[in-house]
């Protein structure tokens, strides 16, 4: 009889890079080896698309309420799970109620996985009013109650060791055999400087925009952004491609020079360099 793994995750399947490359790309392998997989996201696709946009407060409240209701129902389904894997947090708002119930009430063991310094406040201006509801401190308890922790890099692992002695570093990986294996044409006379990421991380480009604008006065190039939402700024060199899973590699191959701007701060210490891995994986 096959064993069932419950993946309790924040985002819809196939939407968030952290999920896609930390475990979703391995699900087929697990299924081929006899495991049954169930993905249980906190946000459904509708709420995910609405949450990080301006306005739509009513839709956001309804969507989040529905998310908590689904999490409540999930507690009654956990008896079917042989293994429980929690990525980042069971719910994106509020204290670690669900993790506490799973560990202390239901007495279930779980693996806790994270790939960012998510104990630190980090939020978009769009949802600044809701940031107090995030309860960033809950990450410490999620770590403390976990049976095992998997962290994306040494900085994150060292932090986790304060709360749990069973920590394993598992870097975010790139599949260069089946996925990131396209050869790029670098013979073009007009180079393309490129960035890829979700709209929630686009604020990292704020300090780059003046530099790009200055370069436009001296060189001919395209500045390509690949994201699920277009940027709010304008540039003469700007090109935008809406991210899709189907064309992701083809679009990345258009980039001559990939950039991954970061600030020198504690939050950036927790980054796992995934954009850099994506750029360098393509020949």
Predicted features along the sequence, with ranges:
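Carbohydrate-associated surface elements
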Residues: 155, 173
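A short, charged, and often flexible helix/loop element on the N-terminal side
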Residues: 42-73, 87-88, 93
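Conserved catalytic-core segment of nucleotide-activated headgroup transferases in glycan assembly
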Residues: 14-29, 38-39, 175-181, 185-254
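Nucleotide-sugar-dependent
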Residues: 91, 203, 245-281
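Nucleotide-activated donor-dependent transferases that construct or modify glycoconjugates
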Residues: 2-15, 42, 194-195
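Membrane-proximal helix-turn-helix segments that form the acceptor-binding/catalytic region
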Residues: 68-80, 94-107, 112-113, 118-120, ...
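Acceptor-binding helix/loop patch of EC 2.4 sugar-transfer enzymes
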Residues: 43-58, 110-140, 168, 175, ...
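An aromatic- and histidine-rich active-site surface loop
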Residues: 11, 20, 84-107, 113, ...
């Amino acid at each position: 009889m096959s064993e069932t793994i419950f993946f309790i995750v924040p985002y819809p399947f196939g939407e968030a890079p952290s999920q896609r490359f930390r475990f979703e790309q391995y699900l087929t392998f697990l299924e081929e080896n006899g495991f049954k997989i169930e993905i249980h996201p906190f946000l459904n696709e509708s709420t995910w698309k609405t949450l990080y946009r301006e306005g739509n407060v009513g839709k956001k409240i309804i969507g989040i309420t529905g998310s908590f209701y689904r999490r409540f129902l999930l507690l009654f389904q956990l008896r079917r799970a042989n293994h429980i894997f929690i990525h980042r947090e069971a719910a994106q708002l509020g204290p670690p109620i669900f993790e506490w119930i799973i560990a202390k009430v239901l007495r279930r063991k779980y693996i806790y996985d994270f790939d960012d310094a998510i104990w630190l406040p980090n939020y978009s201006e769009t949802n600044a009013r809701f940031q107090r509801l995030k309860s960033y401190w809950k990450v410490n308890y999620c770590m403390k109650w976990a049976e095992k922790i998997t962290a994306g890099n040494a900085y994150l692992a060292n932090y986790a060791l304060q709360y749990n002695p069973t920590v394993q570093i598992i870097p975010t990986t790139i599949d260069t055999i089946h996925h990131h294996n396209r050869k790029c044409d670098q013979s073009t006379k007009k180079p393309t400087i490129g960035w890829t990421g979700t709209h929630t991380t686009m604020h990292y480009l704020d300090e780059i925009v003046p530099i790009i604008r200055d370069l436009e006065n001296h060189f001919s190039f395209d500045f390509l952004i690949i994201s699920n939402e277009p940027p709010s700024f304008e540039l003469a060199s700007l090109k935008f491609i809406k991210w899709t899973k189907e064309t992701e590699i083809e679009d990345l191959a258009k980039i001559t020079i990939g950039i991954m701007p970061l600030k020198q701060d504690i939050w950036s210490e927790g980054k796992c360099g995934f954009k850099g891995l994506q750029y360098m994986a393509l020949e």
